[in-house]
């Protein structure tokens, strides 16, 4: 976990939506969002995806708070929110890639949350070995998501996606520890960075869709 958290400041400084959207050596340079996609539609899509991904981190934070409070009913309700949000995120790609791809993304997001939940429970229990196992599962899942999305869209380089997803995971893990420690000042700072970073992720996805499917924008 410590290694994962240490890479976060570097990733936050180096990653951006533009870097994630495409590189000069990528097939993605064949089409750019500004070439034929309607800017207003791209902006609208960015706003929708930002809202969905913000819901992802907010619903998981709700699970974490309920877990720290040992409130089983609140945790159950929060987890239902996580699932509903994952379904919405998965459905957002269906108009572009079809139902099978949407179902696959939902499965991958479920795997992401499963590893996140395992780490949360291990953090509450103070079980270092379980935390490390959860980090391994998170890393494997991030690789699966990166492979899936980069395979679907050439404007999303796999290595860049992996970096974005691991930075995202590090935010979750840092937040859990801060909540456990009652370090609410630093947790608020983590939340600000977490929100900014998830917007980097969602904006990159929107830009990549506009680049690949300009006629839909």
Where is each model-derived feature located?
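A cross-kingdom marker for long, charged
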Residues: 186, 190-217
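Immediate post-signal-peptide N-terminus of mature secreted/exported proteins
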Residues: 30-80
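Long, amphipathic, charge-rich alpha-helical segments that form helical bundles/coiled-coils
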Residues: 55, 104-124, 155-183
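Alpha-helical segments in soluble extracytoplasmic regions
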Residues: 60-150, 194-197, 208
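Bacterial N-terminal signal peptides that target proteins for export
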Residues: 1-8
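Intrinsically disordered, low-complexity polar regions and short flexible loop motifs
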Residues: 123, 144, 156, 190, ...
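Bacterial N-terminal signal peptides
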Residues: 8-17
